[in-house]
Amino acid sequence: MFGAGDEDDTDFLSPSGGAKLASLFGLDQATMGHGNEFFQYTAPKQPKKGQGTAAGNQTAPKPAPATTGTSSVLFATAVHAYRYINGQYAKQGKFGAAVLGNHTSREYRILLYISQQQPVTVATIHLNFELMVRPNNYSTFYDDQRQNWSIMFESEKAAVSFNKQVCVAKCNSISSLDAVLCQDLVAAEGPAVETGDSLEVAYTGWLLQNHVLGQVFDSTANKDKPLRLKLGSGKVVKGLEDGLLGMKKGGKRLIITPSACAAGSEGVIGWTQPTDSILVFEVEVRRVKFARDSGSDGHSVSSRDSAAPSPIPASDSLSADPVVTPLPLPLKPGEPGLRSKSNSLSEQLTVNSNPDTVKAKLISRMAKMGQPMLPILPPQLDSNDSETEDATVLRGAGQSLVTPSIQPSLQPAHPVLPQMASQAPQPSGSGLQTPSAALMQAVSLDSHSAVSGNAQNFQPYAGVQAYAYPQTPSVTSQLQPVRPLYPAPLSQAPHFQGSGDMMSFLMTEARQHNTEIRMAVNKVADKMDHLMTKVEELQKHSSGNSMLLPSMSVTMETSMIMSNIQRIIQENERLKQELLEKSSRIEEQNDKISDLIERNQRYVEQSNLMMEKRNNSLQTATENTQARILHAEQEKAKVTEELAAATAQVSHLQLKMTAHQKKETELQLQLTDNLKETDLLRGHVTRLQADLSELREASEQTQTKFKSEKQSRRQLELKVTSLEEELTDLRAEKTSLEKNLSERKKKSAQERCQAEAEMDEIRKSHQEELDRLRQLLKKARVSTDQAAAEQLTLAQAELQSQWEAKCEQLLASARDEHLQQYREVCAQRDAHQQKLALLQDECLALQAQIAAFTEQKEHMQRLEKTKSQAPAGRAAADPSEKVKKIMNQVFQSLRGEFELEESYDGGTILRTIMHTIKMVTLQLLNHQEEEEEEEEEEEEEKKPLRPSLEQPGPATPGMPPAPPSGETQEAPEVLPEQVVGETTPLPLQALPTPENGAQTRKGEPAEAEVPSEIKDSSLPPQPAGIPAHRVLGPPTSIPPKPPGPVTMDSESEEMLAADQRTVQPNGLLGEEHVREVATDGLLQGNSRRLSLTPDPEKGEPPALDPESQGGEAQPPECKQAEDVSSSGPRETLLDTELASAAAGTSLRHNQDSQHCSLSGDEEDELFKGATLKVPRPTAQPEEEDEDEVSMKGRPPPTPLFGDDDDDDDDDIGWLG
């Protein structure tokens, strides 16, 4: 309008309105190096659900024989497999897909299998192996038989892991990686990125270590936002940048870069410290900004696969010509036809470019202005306006409607101007000031303020429904919102998504047409607004001049209005013609486009038919060639296997031949050496034969001697068994005699107590008589004279002498009785000791003979070994009966040691002893069965069964003298060397400290016996002169308790207390305790504790008194009960010995009237067979009635023996 036709022509004929025809058919792909896509192989589409039934009955071919190396499973998952048969995919079922690999031989392959014994197909993975990733978790590949397989994974995670493992296997299949290796993990659609495009990616980088993904050296998972980069900027390492080329939005890819492509500075992303490492990146493209789209829109990042067209630029950028270069992609066969699209576009363009509609729009807009210039139009215009608006609304919904061309009459009825012009405010703005070219050039107004405001306020239409001119209510001169002229239909939006170059071309063409028409409409609207401002100015000027020339101004206004209206009408007609011409051009171009599309489809169908024919012929040819190749390969494999077997046999035979040659040379050398040795050995053999004849003679002589000695030895053994039986009988007699002696001692002690009681009664009566006589004497002295006093003194002296004589007679008779009993017991003991000494001498002689026999036997064994002609086996006599006999004897002897009527638990002791005897017999029998073939072992086994024949060790020579008053009384003790292994181990019998009735003289401490643990009670007696001493201690006085001992007055001469012993077995074998119970003293007021303290250096027996050598008494709190625990078999304390010791002590006190203990030959002979073994005592607290004295400065009691190991060894010494 107003001479702006050149601008319209240039706008419509600008380069943005045209496009290359070559881009329609993708002929410019040669410039990108892809070649003609129609003659390239395109992979078939993924199978649909109904395609697997067609080839369900066909059997899958047997896979090529896979190498059975030491391949390991790198990854395995379940897939749905499809095989490409006869132009479509046939479902084969659900298989297992595994990636197998052998890192040493660099052999990797994909295995599809039904089970472990049923492989389906094998595809070897090498550098040129291609695993093509498809949408919906599909992947396709060719196996070793060139069969196309498609597998569908159950999840995207499984597909990504499988594809990743295949890529790593491709990298591991070559020795050195020289180029970047890529593998798509997830398929994506859309244009590929190129150099210069901006990306937003998420990545994770690993080091390839030991053929697997190793340490993660970089990842965006640890960062707040993903990485943004521009390809070609050098922000990342070269290998990663090369691997990103060709990716699409939403795609994932695994990129393996060699060390040569991972070089860069330290700040570059993906750079690592080790320079020789292979880097592995997993990259996901999230957002893309293409460099070719940066000029057409102002957004930072645009998505090319979105359905909405690009927004419209602002008014100041209308003059720029956006050059859009669509990415040429091949038109795949099977795409829907585009004829309907082009028709709908052309119809929309023709309908929307109708000049009637444009004129109706303009008139409606002018009518809606604040001050309308034209007269009121008939009501027909409103209906046209509503019709056009309804039509545009329907077109926005995708319907193409043709509105009728309505030409309303624009002739003005009368030029009446409203009076509202003065009220229109001036629009404020800083727009461009352009003078009007049609009216007055001298007047310059701010006319473009409204236009620029409209242009600036213009916003991109939301979706595809409306191009909106947002209005501001405060500005009255602003244009009203207009319906969109050419909205893109919603139904066509899905066809613009990834449908190739034709779709992109049509989209850009439609956009260009829309922008050009919009620009033309905007220009017309701008010119109308400019005209309106001019008219307003003229109205202002005319209102000022109307005061002078009212008629003239009216005529001037009407003439000017008419001229302007005529110009407007002319311009509208011219614009109508231009629009008609352009719409005709667009229709012609649309017809051409549709013809070209139809022609293109025909060519594509023809090419597809030709390709199918070629494919069929190629498939038949390839099947034939594959059959031949398979046959040839099978033959080749057979031949190669035979050749390998033959070469292996040849090499094996050559190795055998060389080995045989070496053996031959070695054997020849050995033969020469052996010949020399045989010469030497022949001479040696002759000498040995002579020696052998001599040895045979000697062996015959020794055999005769051995037989005679064996017979004599058997006789001696019979004698020994008889002697042992006698010895056991003697021991039983000894025990019975000792019991009798103890009973007699008890009786004598009781008689003595009775005698003492009688003496006390006599003394009391005597004292009463004396008192009575003294009283009489006093009376007589008073009453009588000196003669009577003399008679009385004489009578008193006679009575006293008679009383003393009676007392002496009674004491002498009691002493005589005790001495007679004691002498009888000593005589019996001496007789038993003599018998035992004789038996010991005989046993020693027998042992010497046995030792001589064993030496002779060993000598004979050495002679037989030198001859190497020992007899094959001698029937060794079965010693089980002898062992049973010996063990029965042992048991009888043990049972004789105990009496079930006594207070100790005899049943428990018998059970433990029987258990030990059984264990010993089993050990002996097993030991004898292992070596029953050799007769020497029989002798060695019988030897430990006679421990009673061993010679006892020397004992202490005598009893030390009794210590003075206040010192500890030491008891003799047999040293550990004297303890001889006994025939049977006896358990420990715990006995408390006897509560003795103390005999107390004036100023002397009481003494009592101390029980000691006696070992080897069943042992043969010791030789004469080596006594085994009893342990004696000072007795402690106790208060009279029923049934306790009787205690006498302190002024009496002698006191005797009977031993009250309680046997308390505290457990089984090895867990018994000796408890010593302290007794409370009446006279001294405290209790004494007796402890055993050995002196191994001097050979003295241990002291049994808690007092120190200085004569000081130990405090009562230290006199506590001792628990003596034993770890091995223990001996019982004999009650008879304790009783006899008590009796002996009392007799010795009666005779000597002083402190002494049993010592000398009598006591030694009485207890010669008993050996004392007291283990380490452990202190046990006991309540005391008296005041406690501090034990500071006194050493603790020491154990009887220094070590218990010797005792344990002695206990089991009878086993050998």
Curated annotation (Swiss-Prot):
GO terms for biological process: endocytosis. GO terms for cellular component: actin cytoskeleton; axon; early endosome; endosome; growth cone; membrane. The PPIase FKBP-type domain seems to be inactive both for FK506-binding and enzymatic activity. The modification N6-acetyllysine is found at K91. Residues 954-964, 1036-1045 have a biased composition (Pro residues). This is FK506-binding protein 15. Expressed in brain, with highest levels in the granular cell layer of cerebellum and in the granule cell layer of dentate gyrus. The keyword Manganese does not apply. InterPro entries: FKBP-15_dom, PPIase_dom_sf, PPIase_FKBP_dom. Pfam families: FKBP15, FKBP_C. It comes from Mus musculus. The modification N-acetylmethionine is found at M1. Involved in the transport of early endosomes at the level of transition between microfilament-based and microtubule-based movement. May be involved in the cytoskeletal organization of neuronal growth cones. Seems to be inactive as a PPIase. Residues 71-168 are annotated as: Important for function in growth cone organization.
